């Protein structure tokens, strides 16, 4: 049986694709899918996910990639992945996490579709910090100054300056 998840589908900014979570391969386990709105076969974007997992995903502003947050490789450890919207190999975006269960808490895609900004327990155990990585993978860069174990990064926003540069606050 094919079942759709409670996560609402998203339409790509260019209107070409729908991206959605569906239980289509193994009964009780979800996967992330895309399909051309004009027609065609659905393409699975993620591995089969453990039953009951929620998947947070976003489509890049240029409609080329889907970034998603889920514990795909290690149960109980949410991590960040990027995959071409038309299908292909997914790439883990986050660095090795500081602890188990470390985690990526959330993410934002830059308005230029070039980078992903994310909050994660990365360099210091049990401290959520702000990181940046290219949307197609590579080394992550920590954006905040050193934080002690008493503090975390909770909120942030990404935008463009009048000159077209990315700004994170």
How would you name each of these model-derived features?
Residues 27-33, 75-81, 125-131:
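Structural motif
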Residues 13-14, 61-62, 111-112, 160-164:
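Residue-level detector of Asp-centered blade-edge/turn motifs that repeat once per structural unit
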Residues 10, 58, 108, 157-159:
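Conserved beta-strand position repeated across blades of beta-propeller domains
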Residues 1-2, 32, 165-169:
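Low-complexity/repetitive intrinsically disordered segments
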Residues 1-5, 36-53, 84-103, 133-154:
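Multi-bladed beta-propeller domains
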Residues 17-21, 65-69, 115-119, 167-169:
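Residue position within the beta-strands of beta-propeller blades
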């Amino acid at each position: 049986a094919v079942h759709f998840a409670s996560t609402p589908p998203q339409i790509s900014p260019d209107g070409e694709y729908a991206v959605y979570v569906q239980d289509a391969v193994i009964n009780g386990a979800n996967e992330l899918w895309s399909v051309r709105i004009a027609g065609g076969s659905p393409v699975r974007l993620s591995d089969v996910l453990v039953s009951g997992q929620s998947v947070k995903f976003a489509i890049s502003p240029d409609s080329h990639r889907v970034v998603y947050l889920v514990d795909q490789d290690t149960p109980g450890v949410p991590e960040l992945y990027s995959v071409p919207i038309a299908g292909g190999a997914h790439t883990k975006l986050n660095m090795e996490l500081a602890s188990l269960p470390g985690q990526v808490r959330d993410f934002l895609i830059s308005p230029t579709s070039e980078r992903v900004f994310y909050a994660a327990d990365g360099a210091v155990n049990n401290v959520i910090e702000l990181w940046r990585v290219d949307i197609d993978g590579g080394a992550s860069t920590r954006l905040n100054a050193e934080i002690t174990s008493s503090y975390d990064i909770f909120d942030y926003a990404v935008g463009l300056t009048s000159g077209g540069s990315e700004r994170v606050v």
